[in-house]
UniProtKB/Swiss-Prot annotation:
Keywords: Metal-binding, Ribonucleoprotein, Ribosomal protein, RNA-binding, rRNA-binding, Zinc. Belongs to the bacterial ribosomal protein bL31 family. Type A subfamily. This is Large ribosomal subunit protein bL31. The keyword Ribosomal protein applies. One of its GO terms (biological process) is translation. Signal peptide: none annotated. GO terms for molecular function: metal ion binding; rRNA binding; structural constituent of ribosome. The keyword Ribonucleoprotein applies. InterPro entries: Ribosomal_bL28/bL31-like_sf (IPR034704), Ribosomal_bL31 (IPR002150), Ribosomal_bL31_A (IPR027491), Ribosomal_bL31_sf (IPR042105). Binds the 23S rRNA. SUPFAM superfamilies: L28p-like.
Length: 71
């Protein structure tokens, strides 16, 4: 490997929205995520709807019931 071209790795904490903290190494000291293996439905086995940033609500506001009536 060439000297001086690789980013410096530091101990990092990955912090999930559910409160889970994962210790690892990265170029950033803290990384924030919305879901992790402790709360994601695929890993927990629970049927749960994951809505990021209110996309369903935004769609409902924009189109409302007119979307369903056209079908």
């Amino acid at each position: 490997m060439k000297e001086g071209i690789h980013p410096k790795l530091v101990p990092a904490r990955i912090i999930c929205g559910c409160g889970n903290v994962i210790e690892t190494y990265s170029t950033k000291p803290e990384i924030y995520v919305e879901v992790c293996s402790k709360c994601h439905p695929f890993y927990t086995g629970q049927q749960r709807f994951v809505d990021t940033e209110g996309r369903v609500e935004r769609f409902q506001r924009r189109y409302g019931d007119s979307y369903r009536k056209g079908r």
